[in-house]
Regions:
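Short hydrophobic beta-strand element within catalytic cores of glycosyltransferases
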Residues: 153-156, 172-173
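Nucleotide-sugar-dependent
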Residues: 46, 134-141, 163-164, 180
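Acidic donor-binding loop of glycosyltransferase active sites
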Residues: 121-139, 149-153
Length: 181
């Protein structure tokens, strides 16, 4: 059984944000950011379960050369929270950036283990306008449930475990096709 403590994840006012993560987010130049929270799983481009690489590419392609660009905040890691893992994630992001030409929007990496109060402040920070995740498959989708308690929009795939609590009334659901693997 998955669930979460509504005393840990809940809507917050800007004046209630107190952890160092809020100061980090305050330093981001964009006032409109999308947020993705989840592990960057193993697999080549388009093969990782969370489809993080595809999300990065779609974000870059969608907002390149726009006069006013949003930011993308990735709260992610690979298999660990080590310095090597962080460098590996940055290499993956930079490789995708090199494949997209133009004036690209900014991507911000938050790497490491966060406490629940820090994650809740991340979901509730005023620069975070929507949670986005184009996952191929979730057992449950805990970050999607956590972020849903902030009351902000969620943009995600219209399939998998998170459909137990997300629907077209509380989310923007992206349709797709199942493929044999």
């Amino acid at each position: 059984f998955e669930g979460l403590d509504v005393n840990e994840f809940y809507p917050m006012k800007s004046s209630e944000l107190k952890t160092p993560i809020s100061k980090t987010l305050d330093s981001i130049e964009e006032s409109f950011c999308y947020l993705m929270v989840g592990q960057w799983c193993n697999g080549n481009f388009g093969e990782d379960r969370k489809d993080t690489a595809m999300l990065v590419k779609v974000f870059l392609e969608t907002f390149k050369n726009k006069k006013k660009k949003p930011g993308l905040i990735l709260k992610t890691s690979g298999a660990s929270f080590s310095v090597l893992d962080r460098e590996d994630i940055l290499k993956k992001i930079n490789k995708i950036k090199q494949s997209v030409s133009g004036d690209l929007p900014n991507i911000y990496l938050l790497h490491g283990d966060f406490y629940d109060d820090e994650i809740n402040e991340l979901y509730n920070h005023p620069k975070v306008k929507a949670h986005v995740n184009i996952t191929h498959g979730e057992g449950f989708g805990r970050p999607l449930l956590e972020s849903s308690l902030s009351g902000k929009p969620i943009i995600t795939s219209a399939w998998s475990g998170h459909m137990d609590f997300l629907n077209s009334n509380n989310s923007i659901l992206i349709s797709g096709n199942l493929v044999d693997v």
